Amino acid sequence: MIAYIFLALFTIAAVIFIVNSHYRWTYFFAITLFTFLFGGMLMVSSQWQRALNFSSVLFVVLMLFHRLKIHYYKQPLLISDFFLVVDWRNWETLIHYKGALFGVIGLLALLGYAIFGFNDVESLGVLGNSIGALLFIVSFSLMWHYSKNPSAVQVWLDSLPDDGRDVFLNLPMSCRGIFFKVPNFDGNSQNFIEKMTALSSDANNLSETKPDIVVTLMESTLNPHQFAFSQQSIPPLSMFEPQNDTVFASPLRVHTFAGATWKSEFAFLAGVPSTDFGALASGVFYSVVPHLQSGLVKNLKAQGYFCVALSPFTKGNYNAKSAYDHFGFDLMLQPQDLGYPAPISKNLWDISSEEMMKYTRMILEKQHPALENVDQPMFVYVLTMREHGPYELGMENTFNLQMPNLGAKSISALNDYTQRIVALNDAIEGINNYLHERKKPFVLGYFGDHQVAFDNAIPPKKGDYAQPDYVTQFVVRSNCASQFKQEQKFLDLAFAGGVLMNVAGLSAEDEFMKANMAMCKLSDGKLEDSSDIQLLNNYRHYLYQTLAIAR
């Protein structure tokens, strides 16, 4: 009797989810998805109660999983997220978010109940199997056919800025996205080519000496002075302020919030945003990178650079090593490879940024067997981790932070965050001083990969930007004698690699990088922020349809 009460409750919950859909197309896809799940279990088990229980409970699981992702990542659940879920190398992340860990454990328990509940009820025999197979095939065919309907596609795409709130629309519609296909943009490549060729050449900026290039992806980093505090006593942070060696500094458009660092890595290394790939955006390190034909690292290698990635996470985490290999890196190292006292299989969540800079110095000094015979200029790409959450919720208000409508726990989290950024500032200034002391040409770049929430609160920021929660900062410093002059006041992360090459006095080595640098000039550093939508579409058409940078 209790089991049937639960069955009724879960079924009612599933019906409520369907009734509360926000779009007409969601009703269709929610009903067909429910029928698909029901038919699949009925086809296998021939037990109608088990099939109803499976589909109803799974609807609840999917809705809760969707809300869990929005809670932590402020992004909707898409089918490509399951690339990350099924890769066990990523599971350690849950240990650092106890709320998420308990939530996932609860969802797994519900999933087990969905699969095994009512497994001892009477079978309908071959008739049940046949009806289930018919429902399964028909519902799948309907979802597959209508997932490419222009009206359905437009409704779905329009819903994504609102957190993609209808998960039962997101999942069927994003299923086609798990199969890689070249992005298709309506535009005119020839128009872009004409604008690109009309630009003046920067041949005078080219350097005969190729400097070492160090780039730091600063985890979860936004200059805390950008928060709109009514009162604060945060010390000056020199890494964000103009210095004698600062050659470029601007706000930076990133394409993720509160996590998914690999999306920012992708934009920087590939030179195109993950958003170009639609539903595959969450899985670009798995499903898109192998198809790329160009990018920053391949251009640097063509210039003779030896390229090294240094990560505090394991080589398998988020498929990093495989992705870096495809990008063109010669070597990926972890701090453990350079003497850090921890097993090579351990993700270093608490390693300080100062220690990461120490190992960066060791790479530049070639203190690793794989580097001993390297006589090329070096590109070192390093990721920090200490700035990552979670943050202390009981810390004193050390920096006297005040902001209306922000709770005590959020203020505590912001204090913890700020002290980590202060330590990061010391680490960045330390590596910058070291690079100067070497008396060799260098270019040092650093950028924040995304913003974060503080006890689930998102503090308002200074500045008048579209999507202000997706803006960090990018800074380049150098001792190179160069004629480089900053032209952009705002930069998309996809253009950061080209800016670094320009500062270093390096020419583009392929047509993609030439186009990337040209578009940066033509659009004043903007992509999705550009007011010239036709120029943007012409550029994208040139990249994907003419140059075929992804195949």
Curated annotation (Swiss-Prot):
InterPro entries: Alkaline_phosphatase_core_sf (IPR017850), OpgB/LTA_synthase_biosynth (IPR050448), Sulfatase_N (IPR000917). It comes from the Bacteria. The chain crosses the membrane at residues 1-21, 25-45, 99-119, 124-144, 266-286, 490-510. It is found in: Cell membrane. It is a multi-pass membrane protein. It holds the Pfam family Sulfatase. The keyword Coiled coil does not apply. One of its GO terms (molecular function) is transferase activity. GO terms for biological process: lipopolysaccharide core region biosynthetic process. SUPFAM superfamilies: Alkaline phosphatase-like (SSF53649). Its main location: membrane. Keywords: Cell membrane, Membrane, Transmembrane, Transmembrane helix. GO terms for cellular component: membrane; plasma membrane. PANTHER family: LIPOTEICHOIC ACID SYNTHASE, PHOSPHOGLYCEROL TRANSFERASE I. This is Uncharacterized protein HI_0275. It comes from Haemophilus influenzae (strain ATCC 51907 / DSM 11121 / KW20 / Rd).
